[in-house]
Regions:
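Anion-binding (especially nucleotide phosphate/pyrophosphate-binding) glycine-rich loop
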Residues: 5-58, 86-171
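Gly/Ser/Thr-rich beta-alpha loop segments that engage phosphate groups in nucleotides
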Residues: 65, 71, 79, 161-163, ...
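Short Gly/aromatic-enriched secondary-structure transition segments
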Residues: 76-83
C-alpha cells in the first residue's frame, strides 16, 4: 500500500494497522504496542533523512532458520528453511534518480549509483555490495532498475544465524 508518511504514522499510532501487525507478530497486546512504536519510529527516522519524500511503502522481510542444508543454497543446493518472527522492516520511497540510498539503523548510509553497476572492491563485505550486485543482476536480466530511498531497522541481529543478510536481500529487491 502507498500512503503519505503522515497517513502511515496515524495508521500505526492509532492501532488501525493492528490486524496486519498481528499477522506478522501475533496478537499479544505488549507485542502489538512494541511493533506499533517500532514502525512509527522507523517512519519518523525516514522522514528526517529524506524529508522531500512523502509517498512511502513499508515492507517486512523475516529472518529465517535453516532446518536442513544450512548454507548449501550458496552452491545451488537445497535448503529446508523456516521464517521466524524476527524481521527487518523497510520504509521506502521510489524515485527516478539513478541512485539507491539505504540507511540502516545504527549503520552508515549506503549509496549506490545505478549508472555504475560494476564491482567496487572497496564495497566488499558491505551492504552496498549486496545492493549493487542485486541491481546488476536485475539489469543483466533486462529488468528496469530505478532508484529509491530506504530506511531499515531489524530485529534480526547480524551474525545471529537467522539470515540477516537474506533479510537485507529481500528488502533490497523492493
Amino acid at each position: 500500500m502507498l500512503f503519505r508518511s503522515t497517513e502511515w504514522t496515524e495508521a500505526f499510532a492509532s492501532g488501525k494497522m493492528d490486524d496486519k501487525l498481528s499477522l506478522l507478530y501475533g496478537n499479544a497486546k505488549a507485542t502489538l504496542e512494541q511493533q506499533r512504536q517500532r514502525y512509527v519510529d522507523a517512519i519518523q527516522a525516514f522522514t528526517e533523512l529524506y524529508p522531500e519524500r512523502e509517498d512511502l511503502y513499508i515492507y517486512s522481510a523475516p529472518g529465517r532458520t535453516e532446518v536442513g542444508g544450512n548454507h548449501t543454497d550458496h552452491q545451488h543446493g537445497c535448503v529446508l528453511a523456516a521464517a521466524v518472527n524476527l524481521d527487518a522492516i523497510a520504509i521506502v520511497s521510489f524515485h527516478e534518480d539513478q541512485v539507491i540510498r539505504l540507511k540502516s539503523a545504527n549503520y552508515p548510509q549506503d549509496v549506490v549509483d545505478l549508472t555504475d553497476l560494476s564491482v567496487h572492491l572497496a564495497e566488499m563485505g558491505k551492504s552496498a555490495a549486496l545492493i549493487r550486485g542485486i541491481a546488476a543482476r536485475f539489469a543483466e536480466m533486462g529488468v528496469s532498475v530505478s532508484g529509491f530511498d530506504a530506511y531499515t531497522t531489524s530485529s534480526v541481529l547480524s551474525g545471529s544465524g537467522l539470515s540477516s543478510s537474506a533479510a537485507l536481500d529481500r528488502k533490497s529487491v523492493v
